[in-house]
C-alpha cells in the first residue's frame, strides 16, 4: 500500500521550487525586461504549479513519459525511465498530492516563495493587468544568487539529488510546453479532470503500472 504524505513543509516546497526554476526556467536577460541579475524565468503561476505537480506526483510523471514514448517524442528506451520513476525511486516517500482549483492542480505558494524572495534568490514580477484590481500573471525569475545557491545545495545536500533527477525527468517530457499545454495533458486523466474543485487530486499509480508493464512487454524491455 502506498503511503502518501499529503503536505510538504514550507522549506521543502521552497527548495523544490528553487530547483524547478533552475532546471525548467527559460533563459532570460535584462534586455528582455527581466530584473538585472535574472538568469531564468517561468512565466505564470499556472505553469509553475503544473510543473510542480509532475515533480510531486511520480505516477502522473511516469504516465507522461509513457505517452511521449508512444507518440515518438521519446525513444522506447525511455520507458525504463518511466519504470524508475514509478517503481525504483521510492515514489511513496516523495508523493505529495495537490488540490484542484478551477485552473487545475494548485497549492498556495506565497509562504514558500517568501523564503526564496527575502534573501534575494528569486524575484516575482507582475506582468500586465487585466483590470485595476487583477494582475494578468506573475512571472517568477531566478536570480544569479539563486542559481548559485541551487548549485551549492546540490553539492552540500546530497539528499536533494532525488528532486534534481525528478525535475530532469519532468524537463524530458515538458520542455517548451506552455501552461495551457501542460494543463491539457493533465486533464486527459479522468481522475484529474473529475476531481471536484477544492479536493485532492487522486492518484493513478495502479493504472500506470499496468500501462507501463504492457508497454515494456510490447517493446521487449520487460
Describe every region a protein language model picked out:
Residues 50-57, 115-118, 145:
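Alpha-helical scaffold segments in carbohydrate-active enzymes
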Residues 113-129:
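A short, conserved structural fragment
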Residues 172, 184-222:
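Long, low-complexity, charge-rich intrinsically disordered regions
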